[in-house]
Amino acid sequence: EHKNNLRDILPDASDKLVSAIQNCEEARKRAEEELEYDIRYGIEPIPMNDDRYPQRLKDCDDAPLILFYKGNANLNQQRVINIVGTRHCTPYGEDLIRRFITDLKQLSPNVLIMSGLAYGVDIVAHRQALANGYETIGVLAHGLDDLYPRQHRETAARMIEQGGLLTEFLTRTNADKINFVRRNRIVAGMSDACIL
């Protein structure tokens, strides 16, 4: 139907031009759906030209043009560290993270702690940050309409109140393997230091 309308308006247009115009219409519709969802669920789209966009990330060549954020932490906090590692954290690793964050709180109480909300080191870091009164940001490898892994929903809900969830991905984006790699560049790009 749409193609026929375009043919009426542009009878001499090539199939390639008609297809390009239709793709623009589909993209506009998808953007409207995304914004409606974001408004309904309190998600903030933060374009790169917004003051809230992480300044450190702007310095990266492959920084996303837009981020989607749900939370209350300042993404441009003076000190930001990320804590990442294996998805199979040992009791020794858990204790090391707990002691590190507890000691860090004594030395520098205003640090934003970031990770990827994954199993293992990531979730331990987020939970210890919350337990020590730190704001913590989980950078996701999918849209904010879902959560992977689902077992971390309770922690993620607490993080929204004491930090937040951040992604470059639109809703309805699956947690595909390549997205975890893309997610990691945001975690690294926003941080002053990485604890691995």
Q: What is the meaning of each model-derived region?
A:
Residues E1-R52:
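Short, small/acidic-rich helices and loops at N termini and domain boundaries
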